[in-house]
Amino acid sequence: MTTTPIFSGKIDYKEIKTWDQTEFDEKNLVNDKDKVPIENFHINGPIQFKIDTEINSRICLWMGDICNLNTDTIVYSNSKTLTESDTISDKIFKYGGSEMMNDIQKNGECRYGESIITSGGNLPSRFVVHTVCPTYNPKYLSAAENALNSCYRSAFHLSMDVKSKSISFSTLHSEKRQFPSVGGCHIALRTIRRFLEKPFSKSFEKVILAINTFEDLRLYEQMLPIYFPRNQQELKFSQISLPKDVGDENGEAIVESRKIRIIETPSTIIREPEDYNCFYSNNNNNNNNVNNVNNNNSNNNNSNNNNSSSNNIDIIQKNNKNEFNNYKYDSIDKILNPFSSNFSSSPYDATMDNDSFMLKREDPDIEKRRQFSKKSEKQIENEKLKAQFQTLLTRSKVEDLSDVSRLNFTLQTTDDQNRPIVVIIGSQLNSRKDLYDQVLLYLIRVLEQTIQRGNFSIIYFHSNMSSQQSPDLSWLKKLLEIFELKYNNYLKDFNIVHPTFLLKTTLFISKSILGDKGVLSKIIYHENMNKISKLISKCNIPKSIFSYEFSKNEIDNFSFSFDNDVTL
């Protein structure tokens, strides 16, 4: 039987300075978004997070090991099975003891955004809240953000259930989950602020943010004035720095398309004629008509019995006709929505909001499908291609392409009019066909720099390229589509030197697929280097290209017949 070790090194949370006691540091007011000087900024519009000295007296920022704090509850992040090993969790389970493990086994697995509470064992804190931070995925951004928001809220509510008066949070958004530090910090602070604004949060005397790295400490020092301003200067800084979406009353991100949509009653409804009587509202008129018919019948009893029946029938038909014409029908809106102020005259009903909860908004899914259906197949393909190009462009800016750069397959020079020329050596890629994906990114990076100088030309050397080492048709198709999308308007001509029969065939097939326009219409084949020799004289062309030129065109000397009148 193992015994739980005794914890030493307890820190009294009451000795930690609260946010309102922390010295104001103007250096923390760093605004990188709009570069607006704080003193020149004027507050316009509603203030999202006002100066609240009572809340500021309950929030604390502290750097250290959360396990040392003697708050009633400590909160940390773990995996769904609560078996993740790191500095904090290892220490918690070391001193938590068998009682904590029993509580975990009773609760079982914990899902993303949820929390469970257990005994603190021999830790200074009485309780430990185990929560599960979601794995960050930009594709499911709102789900990840709201799950992290739920981690903080569920921890607060579980602590309230056990009558905690103090609580400390570690940094729940962890690097293991790829959660951005800045985004996670925004969610944490706005969720805590929204909770402390609620009346039932008064039971918490202290809420401590226990930070364990200097990077996070610096980040929280810059973010706290945004959500917990202490003076007018920080309030102005908050107005500048707040993101557009500050969430709802709980700090949870608002997803417009997920709001409840209930259709409002239609203004008209088609009914069968025999069903109209169910909408009659002129009850007094109905009674009068019936009385008139009865009176007429009683008078007619004194008349000739032979004429009695016919007269009664005429009177009833006449009254029914007048009755039908005089009836006023209630609209279906009033019948199904009788409390709407549009149809009511009572003072109480007049105060009802016209935009009631039954107001319908267009289903965003239907709206998107409607817009999508209006687009042609070509428009849809262009949008997909633009999205793919934006992804490639972003990757070309951030990825490490040093391996491709060392191949030296691109050179740059200028023509006699000082227009840029991009020279591509295909044989330099012969042995690295596995890098074609990075080659595409590198070409995008080079061309993005080139178009800053205006129109340009390309000279591509296909010398010494074997059929096995040539790029496949799908890669070439993607390259041509990107050129057509972004660089066609800048491209003056596309010169291919030493083309093979296979390359010409491949490009011919590409013309049949993509059409003989754009980049493909600007291709110029050169069987030798006579017409481009003047242009490439400034480049350090590999000797293998000259060797190929000599052997293919049976040249036995190093002189070329230059055509000085030819320019690209």
Swiss-Prot record:
Domain Macro: 46-228
Superkingdom assignment: Eukaryota
Pfam families for the chain: CRAL_TRIO_2, Macro
InterPro entries tied to this protein: CRAL-TRIO_dom, CRAL-TRIO_dom_sf, Macro_dom, Macro_dom-like, Macro_GDAP2
Location of region: Disordered: 281-313
Segments forming domain CRAL-TRIO: 397-553
Family: Belongs to the GDAP2 family.
Name of protein: Protein GDAP2 homolog
Lineage: Eukaryota, Amoebozoa, Evosea, Eumycetozoa, Dictyostelia
Record gene name: gdap2
